[in-house]
């Protein structure tokens, strides 16, 4: 059911021995599994901020790729893909695209609202999270709880988040991040297993939010949905230059 690899299954296999679990630490707790680092994965993480393919930071421990399942038979592992996202270009007018996005966003939010407990929203005051609050309000959710994180910096988004909270009459909570992170590191590393750029503030914010709600929505991924950041366009343009350089070198040789 994990089409995009949100919560992958981890596994370790050697000879006729197979272990799997929802976290790598569960596998590492077995005495037959060596605790060795995967230097190649660490190199990828340091350069790309993510690890390609199904590797982890632990040697010989992998995870099942998104939209795939693992078949173990006769001491052999076979990974089979059951889901492949194939985006296609559909011609439509601006208004058609606008209405289509609005409809799909509302449907996505409605799906996530299936819960027996109150639901909160990480509210930055930006377009992504503000849209979630607006959709929840349109869907008739009265008890909306919103949460905003700040760093005691001029760039804090408390003011813009408060405007949205007032507009939709949410129960709004704010928190200033303690910039003394060392005391949090042991728990952060234990729970995450893989370093991420916003891991520390995410962990602290989740702790704060968990005192009020157990389910929370966020606007992460909005930029990627609309072709990513400016740097992606630059890299795409440079790709043609790279191809030209390689071809020139080959012709010269």
Task: Tell me the role of every PLM-derived stretch.
Residues 1-190:
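Cysteine-centered catalytic environments shared across enzyme families
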Residues 3, 149, 221-222, 230-234:
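An acidic- and aromatic-residue-enriched active-site/binding cleft used to recognize and process polar
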Residues 51, 100, 176-180, 203-207, ...:
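Short C-terminal domain-edge/linker segments immediately following a structured domain
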Residues 100, 196-200, 236:
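A conserved catalytic-core signature of glycosyltransferases
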Residues 116-119, 174-228:
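Conserved adenosine/adenylate-binding substructure
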Residues 226-252:
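A mobile, often basic/glycine-rich helix-loop segment
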